[in-house]
Amino acid sequence: MTTTEYVHSLAKKARAAAADLRRRTSAEKDARLLELADALEKEKGALDAANAADVAAAREAGLSPALVDRLTLTPARFAAMVEGVRTVAALPDPVGEVVWTRTRPSGITIEKTREPFGVVAVVFESRPNVLVDTAALCVKTGNAVVLRGGKEAARSNAALAAVARRILGDAVQFVAIPGHEAVAELVRAVGLVDVAIPRGGERLIRAMCEAALIPVLKHYKGV
């Protein structure tokens, strides 16, 4: 299977899951998120072991202390990650919320409502907790997500993604192959991925924008 075929297969699964999410009630989505929080706590030992392996490899490779720190899922960060999922579950469902209503002179009423994008691709660096944060936010808002993390956190991301996929199903897809080509294919997947969101340094963001054929929600210098 080529990189293009692999990425497209993930995106197609995500698109089918996004259609299913549109049929889910707020209570159903929230229940899944609470189940995810519980599952993360239950799997903490295995998740900690995966993260410890990433941290050890990063130190052995001579990566900067700042990067190693961002990579590390400390007990406090793990607890905050789990609590973050529960916090998202407790938020009001934004899907279908009426932002404004206007009545035209003709008598026609126009409403602006909040609706899901569909499939969101999120590419992030270093911090493995971003995977869980993003998955929770996307499912809450009715979006499926295709996630790609940094190579430094490969073991942590794979372990967290496995838990998220077990609970949230195909609404969460994880790009497990290395290399920049997979990211380029994600942002060129017209008709499969609706929007891409980079979370990382300026170099990553510019590379994604240069390759993109789909909309990219971006910043260059921070927000």
Tell where the protein language model's regions lie, with residue ranges:
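Short alpha-helical
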Residues: A46, N129, R155, E181, ...
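A glycine-rich helix N-cap at a beta->alpha junction
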Residues: R166-V175
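N-terminal Rossmann-like NAD(P)+-binding subdomain of aldehyde/semialdehyde dehydrogenases
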Residues: M1-T109, L137
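Short, surface-exposed connector motifs at secondary-structure boundaries
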Residues: T141-V146, G169-D170, L186-V193
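Conserved NAD(P)+-binding/catalytic subdomain of aldehyde/semialdehyde dehydrogenases
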Residues: V119, V175-V223
